Amino acid sequence: MASIERTAYPQFKRNPVVRELVAAYTPTDAEVAFVAEYTRQPAHRLTLTILLKTFQRLGYFPMLDEVPPAVVRHIRSALKLRVQVKPANLANASRYRYYRRIRQFLQVRAYSDGGLKIAARAVYEAAAVMDNPADLINVAIEQLVRDRVELPAFSTLDRLTRRIRTP
């Protein structure tokens, strides 16, 4: 099993500095308009913006409880919401609707929409010249990003590289 730290798989930084927060998590006017179009309540505006900005940064949708508090505070402040506003607990239907709208807005395809074929082809071709699992995972990540496909869970990429490397 490859270690996630040895790959390019995106993760949150433990203690992001203000400059990083501003650069990666401040919503643009177009993003604020997008969020306002689909939400009314402050908690839902915060939630949709968190999902949007973290997806842009990571390439996949993290669980809301995995988002560092500093990121939540920064986005809440950027939206000019009160400190008491917390991310909404979304029902599955709402969460998946938000995911679909974010993908449409960013023009990114879901991994389930052909991502496995793209990643498998990239890993298969790269396996002819390299055999380090972390390198093969990086090849898959690079190809998925290039083709504007959402990244799957790290374990999915790890299993894929093990399956392709094993004759």
Language-model regions: role of each:
Residues 2-167:
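Long amphipathic alpha-helical coiled-coil/heptad-repeat bundle
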